[in-house]
A protein has these predicted regions:
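Hydrophobic anchor at the beta1->P-loop junction of P-loop NTPases
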Residues: 7
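Conserved substrate/cofactor phosphate-moiety recognition/catalytic segment
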Residues: 19-64
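Glycine-rich phosphate-binding loop used to anchor ATP phosphates in small-molecule kinases
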Residues: 48, 53-105
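Small-molecule kinase domains that catalyze NTP-dependent phosphoryl transfer to phosphate-bearing small molecules
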Residues: 88, 97-141
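Walker A (P-loop) ATP-phosphate-binding motif of ABC ATPase nucleotide-binding domains
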Residues: 4
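The conserved Walker
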Residues: 11
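Conserved lysine of the Walker
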Residues: 15
């Protein structure tokens, strides 16, 4: 069964850098990994709607794509600004990239709610370091 990691946080916090580094490190250890980047998915579906309905649709789309993956692990990086977006995606592991106080977009800053509970909090923009920490914490128990 494919496990899902959601790497979430404000735009510009370093989610994609961390997701890519984590994918690389896990693949070098022999795991099959699928990376879902929200911006790439929006581009693929030509859906740049950031309304409440558009954000919900994107969360469901990310979930559907994760559900159809055949890899050992799906790593998704997207803002997921509200708790309901995270519930829709239903991650096995929730990683909050909490490296900035304000993102690039005022509308996202206004609605963003940090998770009350998560599996791991990233506090600096050092993808290599945090990818190693995540692997140790999540996979070497």
């Amino acid at each position: 069964m494919t496990r899902r990691i959601l790497i979430m946080g404000l735009p510009g916090s370093g989610k994609t850098f961390l997701a890519r580094e984590l994918c690389d490190q896990l693949m070098s250890r022999g795991m099959s990994v699928t990376h879902l980047n929200a911006d790439a998915i929006r581009e693929q579906f030509n859906d740049w709607d950031f309304s409440a309905a558009g954000r919900l649709r994107q969360a469901q789309r990310m979930r559907d794509l994760a559900d159809s993956a055949t890899a050992d692990l799906v790593i998704a990086d997207f803002v997921a600004p509200l708790p309901e977006h995270r519930v829709i995606f239903d991650p096995d592991y929730l990683i909050h990239v909490n490296t900035i106080d304000q993102g690039r977009y005022a509308d996202t800053n206004q609605i963003f709610q940090a998770p009350a509970c998560c599996d791991f909090v990233v506090t600096t923009q050092d993808a290599d370091h945090w990818a190693r920490q995540l692997i140790n914490c999540l996979f070497n128990k």
